[in-house]
Amino acid sequence: YGVSEFGSNETTNPPSAAAQMDTDTYRRAMYVARFAINALDSGFTYMSYWVLGNSYYDGTMMDLGLWKYKNKNWELRPQYYTYSLITRYTDRNSSIYGTDLNEFGNVCMVALQNEGGKWTYLLANSGATQEKLSVVNANFSSGSMDKYEVTENSIPMDGQTLGIDKSNTVSVENGALNLIIRPNSVMVLTNIAAE
């Protein structure tokens, strides 16, 4: 099961399905990431963000996109960076492995293994403090993963830069990936080669 369209409930006053108050905020970027991670963790097999790019719909500008309309030079919004990073490293037909992070109320995570045996871990920390976490995966007990992080300060401010660069590489040590997840951040770990 899944969801054909998702967005937030931060409607304008008066309410409009074509505009929301958080579309240009980092809060929206975190919401989109947490929604995607929690949806996958709960068993969703598909989801689609509404609307990918600003466009006219029945004569009204749908001002909800991951990027703005041509009159704003197709400027990328903060949620573009979290959504595109997640979709870049989650392959169709991947096996999804849920996690149990009950002791970390602000951290959510899901693991995916693609048909080629490569792994991606998606994590988000919506809390105000960093969290330490050890990820143990019996099917990935040695090797390393590329680490990508999104924070409010790491999002390119020009609205034109297309992606988030790898921040570093994390290696499995003693069967675990030992991580520090920054406050209010999204992290993607993967051994899928960047394209």
Residue ranges and their predicted role:
Residues 37-40, 44-47, 133-138, 144-146:
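Internal hydrophobic scaffold segments of catalytic domains
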Residues 9, 55, 129, 153-155:
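Surface-exposed, flexible loop/turn segments at secondary-structure boundaries
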Residues 3, 7-109, 115-116:
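Aromatic/acidic polysaccharide-binding cleft in carbohydrate-active enzymes
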Residues 102-142, 150, 184-190:
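Carbohydrate-binding surface patches
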Residues 135-169:
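C-terminal accessory region downstream of the catalytic core in glycan-modifying enzymes
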Residues 163-195:
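C-terminal beta-strand-rich structural cap/linker in extracellular carbohydrate-active enzymes
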Residues 97-103, 115, 127-129, 168-177:
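Ser/Thr- and Asn-enriched, surface-exposed coil loops between beta-strands
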Residues 39, 47, 83, 121, ...:
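Hydrophobic, well-ordered secondary-structure elements that form the walls
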